[in-house]
């Protein structure tokens, strides 16, 4: 049963903590830093699947990160809607075959490896190559907002 009073309260709920006073200025500044298209490489892969194009994309992320994504698109002269897939903690992007069902329905799919997780993306100079999946979620909690793990993840997504 729906509680109408609770539904109304949820519409204006702001969380348990106040938004920091410099929140908008911080993110405006971070987005300004990535406003130029990054260096990237887009490689097409021919899996001999009719009506589908498959690509691997790598691009330079923030703080010397290297971001990897797979892209699957229906062969079409028209614009198509695109689904962006981001895996959970300690995951990696979808397999090519997992993405194909969406192209049949007319959608493109972009599946990105989050830096420092189990995929091909790299977290720049802050971590060794390979899987560094534990502890990322709290990185920067002591060092400050410029060092936060998810700050760079969000900026990677913005660039994508």
Model-derived regions: residue spans:
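Short, hydrophobic/aromatic alpha-helical segments in well-folded domains
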Residues: 82-85, 98, 160
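Short beta-strand element of the alpha/beta-hydrolase
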Residues: 69-74, 78-90, 109
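Long amphipathic N-terminal alpha/beta scaffold segment
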Residues: 35-77
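Short, flexible loop/turn elements at secondary-structure junctions
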Residues: 61-63, 87-90, 116
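Alpha/beta-hydrolase active-site loop
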Residues: 128-160
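Short amphipathic alpha-helix adjacent to the substrate-entry channel of hydrolases
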Residues: 94-130
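N-terminal targeting or regulatory segments adjacent to alpha/beta-hydrolase or S9 domains
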Residues: 1-52
């Amino acid at each position: 049963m729906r509680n109408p009073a609770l539904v109304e309260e949820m519409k204006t709920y702001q969380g348990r903590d106040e938004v920091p006073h410099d929140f908008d200025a911080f993110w405006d500044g971070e987005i300004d830093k990535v406003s130029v298209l990054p260096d990237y490489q887009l490689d097409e892969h021919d899996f001999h699947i009719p009506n589908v194009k498959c690509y691997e994309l790598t691009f330079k992320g923030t703080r010397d990160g290297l971001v990897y994504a797979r892209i699957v698109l229906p062969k079409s002269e028209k614009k198509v809607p695109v689904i962006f897939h981001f895996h959970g903690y300690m995951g990696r992007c979808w397999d090519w075959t997992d993405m194909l069902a969406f192209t049949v329905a007319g959608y493109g799919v972009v599946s990105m490896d989050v830096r420092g997780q189990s995929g091909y993306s790299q977290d720049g100079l802050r971590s060794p190559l390979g899987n560094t999946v534990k502890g990322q979620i709290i990185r920067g909690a002591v060092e400050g907002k410029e060092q936060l793990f998810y700050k760079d993840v969000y900026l990677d997504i913005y660039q994508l």
